[in-house]
Swiss-Prot record:
CDD domains: Ferrochelatase_C, Ferrochelatase_N. Gene3D superfamilies: 3.40.50.1400. It is found in: Cytoplasm. Involved in coproporphyrin-dependent heme b biosynthesis. Catalyzes the insertion of ferrous iron into coproporphyrin III to form Fe-coproporphyrin III. Fe-coproporphyrin III binds at residues 12, 14, 29, 45-46, 53, 124. Belongs to the ferrochelatase family. One of its GO terms (cellular component) is cytoplasm. SUPFAM superfamilies: Chelatase (SSF53800). This is Coproporphyrin III ferrochelatase. PROSITE patterns: FERROCHELATASE (PS00534). It holds the Pfam family Ferrochelatase.
Length: 309
């Protein structure tokens, strides 16, 4: 009989329907109910991208697509995917409990975010481990980051180069690549959190493989907590770069994300485009990985390497 291994795929989660918005937002705010104004603001942003975020369907397609890719590529073990979300059901704890009930003794966990941070990935891993400890299993081997995977870097480079083909050859010199990820509170730097450096490394690796001659690092989608967050924000960065260099084309590459969701469809496609329109430059963004076969191959390689080692 083929050995069964759990595949715990963890992600942020998103409201499934309009009625979920309040409890979802309350969970993000550690149980503090948001004001009517905050809910209206979030509703407005979802409305601007054409309704609720497609993230739930994409996460599902990524998890089960990864399960299939792993099982199709070898017959040593059978992987079974379980989705665990941070802010809405099925919660991380629900997924661990389902694995335990199914008699899974060993699992590999991966967070659908390439960079490690104590604030994000570590928090997911901690919840999974605590849930497993409480139940007496399964044993979870956590993948902390996977931004260095050569197939991941190549995937983004290919997408950027494809996008650059839309730019007239004589304007390529006036083009800049903006590489970004979700901002986090600046206090993470006090604890030598590797997150900012990992984004820098990702940008450097990608830049070596693209035809675009300039790049800059930015942060986006910061929370409204009143404390300082990592910067520069991508919108401020766009204005600053245009003011200094008069770039004609901006290619936004939110490599910290793996799907087309609110932070990309609104914070990039709407908010950043407002700025490029304002300064008279062109806005470009390569397609997100979503559940594309080349991205599933990235994840498959990462999980299989973890399992094999």
């Amino acid at each position: 009989m083929t050995k069964k291994v759990g595949l715990l795929v963890m992600a942020y989660g998103t409201p499934y329907k309009d009625e979920d918005i309040e409890r979802y937002y309350t969970d993000i705010r550690h149980g503090h109910k948001p004001s009517e104004e905050m809910i209206a603001d979030l509703r407005g942003r979802y409305h601007a991208i054409g309704g609720l975020s497609p993230l739930a369907k994409i996460t599902e397609a990524q998890a089960y697509g990864l399960e299939k890719a792993l099982n199709d590529s070898q017959d040593e073990v059978e992987f079974k995917a379980y989705i665990g979300l941070k802010h809405i059901e099925p919660f991380i704890e629900d997924a661990v409990e389902a694995m335990h009930k199914d008699g899974i003794e060993e699992a590999i966990s991966i967070v659908l975010a390439p960079h490690y941070s104590s604030f994000s990935v570590e928090a997911y891993n901690k919840r999974a481990k605590e849930a497993a400890d409480k139940l007496g299993g399964p044993r979870i081997n956590a993948i902390n980051d996977w931004y260095k995977q050569p197939k991941f870097i190549q995937m983004w480079a290919d997408r950027i180069n494809e996008t650059a083909k839309q730019i007239p050859a004589d304007e390529l010199l006036d083009t800049v690549l903006i590489v970004s990820a979700h901002s986090l509170p600046e206090k993470i730097k006090q604890h030598n959190d590797p997150y900012p450096n990992q984004l820098q490394e990702t940008a450097d690796f990608i830049f070596e493989k693209v035809v675009v001659p300039h790049y800059a690092l930015g942060w986006q989608s910061e929370g409204k907590t009143g404390e300082p967050w990592l910067g520069p924000d991508v919108q401020d960065l766009t204005r600053e770069l245009y003011g200094r260099e008069k770039y004609k084309h901006f290619i936004y590459t939110p490599v910290g994300f793996v799907a087309e969701h609110l932070e990309v469809l609104y914070d990039n496609d709407y908010e950043c485009k407002v700025v490029t329109d304002e300064v008279g430059a062109a806005y470009h963004r390569p397609p997100m990985p979503n559940s594309d076969p080349e991205f599933l191959e990235v994840l498959r390689t990462v999980v299989w390497e973890k399992y094999s080692n």
